[in-house]
Amino acid sequence: MEVHPGGFIIIPDDMDINTVTPVQYAFDEVSKGIKSTHFDFHDTDANLLMIDILGHTLQSMLVKLGELTGTDPLKIRIDDPKIMSLFSSTEALGISKEQIGDFSFGTLGIREFFSPFFTHLIQSCRPQNISDLIRMSALSHGTGVWKGNGEDLIREGMTLKDIICTRDDIMRYLIRQGMDRIKAFEIMEMVRKGKGLNPGAEQDMRNVNVPEWYTESCKKIGYLFPQAHCAGYTDFALRLAYYKIYHPQEFYKVWFMYNCNIEYIEKILQDAKHFHKKVVLYEDESTGYYSSFVDVYLEQRYVAREMYARGISYDPSE
């Protein structure tokens, strides 16, 4: 099951949703009457329309953290070495990976960096700087960009800077190769919309000595994210990571405030004290998607366990 908190499925008035997919209540939303498609949206996106109306929980969390700590989120230096260290170890948090289910990174609770797929990207790409994180954000949001494409190229020895991650990468690369700007833009538009390459575009690429592997990579892409969008996601997530390192008490308080239903938080906190489940990634061979801690309740227990490992407690009544 896949639940998108801002994805609205649109169907005609005279149609029953059950004709296409079963529906169910989403997690703990029974009392609110909010239903979700039972199937992952990728199983139905060929015959259903979805409109993304995204919330801004992360921004709200940053505002609240700024109020509680007195540290303005906009004045945080996101190039702090301790923040980048979260993508290679838990040392900056003062705990070992064994204390949090053999999870090697300090990204628990940082939503942009803690999805199963992004964790797989960290393991595969070993990011060294913010630019790498922006590229990885694009890979995690694109379609046909990583599995069977960029992942194979990375395994062959290429780096994140070499492969296609964002739509901007294509236009800039083609211009550097000497292609006319208009042609470069048109090819970028074809590829980022999943339209592949027509014979004319392929010839234009050969004319400026674009290697065959690059052309083949373009043909596999279904959708490409814009770099600026990914830079925004990454920027906010890094600011949240700052609070996790330097203001842990406030971080966990705000995290549970925005990510846990008050009706269940007592049970989650109690469970976490005796929680020994390892953080493991499972790959669905049919789709290439990674899962395990995508389950919201499991994620809450992971975060609570990490909080206790750092010697921090949280009183839900506050």
Q: Where is each model-derived feature located?
A:
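Noncatalytic, beta-rich nucleic-acid-contacting surfaces in large DNA/RNA-processing enzymes
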Residues: 1-318
